[in-house]
Regions:
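Residues in flexible loops and secondary-structure boundaries
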Residues: 14, 29-31, 98
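Generic hydrophobic/packing signal
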Residues: 6, 26, 33, 76-77
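Short aromatic-glycine-(Arg/Gly/Cys) micro-motifs in beta-strand/loop hairpins
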Residues: 1-16
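Short, mixed-charge low-complexity intrinsically disordered segments
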Residues: 38-101
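A short, exposed loop/beta-hairpin motif centered on an aromatic-Gly-Thr core
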Residues: 14-25
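A short, charged, amphipathic alpha-helix used as a generic interaction element across diverse proteins
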Residues: 24-43
């Protein structure tokens, strides 16, 4: 397990959130962050993580949602795009790989 020092900027509300989380991976840490900060699920966030050696903050991911209509129903899908090109989708419990990307 690793300790992830997560820093998030809730873009539209201009709120800064910080949380240290122990997890096996960055995606697990971000999933835990969203479970503890449910108000962020409908937001737009820039997510930073503190580098272990230097202590500098590095932009690690961007979180946003898209709204679309499917069979006459309005739906929103929330995406996490990581700096290494990974695309994840929030399934209501955690982030999973987006099979459509």
């Amino acid at each position: 397990m690793f300790t992830y020092d997560i820093h998030a900027v809730y873009v539209k509300r201009q709120i800064y959130l910080r949380l240290s989380i122990e997890a096996n991976s960055f995606i697990d840490a971000i999933s835990e962050f969203f479970k503890k900060n449910k108000e962020c699920i409908n937001g737009v966030l820039d997510i930073y993580c503190k580098r272990p050696k230097s202590g500098d903050l590095a932009l690690m991911a961007h979180y946003d949602g898209i709204t679309y209509f499917y069979e006459g129903t309005r739906q929103t899908k929330y995406f996490l795009s990581t700096k290494d090109g990974g695309k994840y989708v929030w399934n209501g419990e955690r982030f999973i790989m987006d099979d459509e990307s």
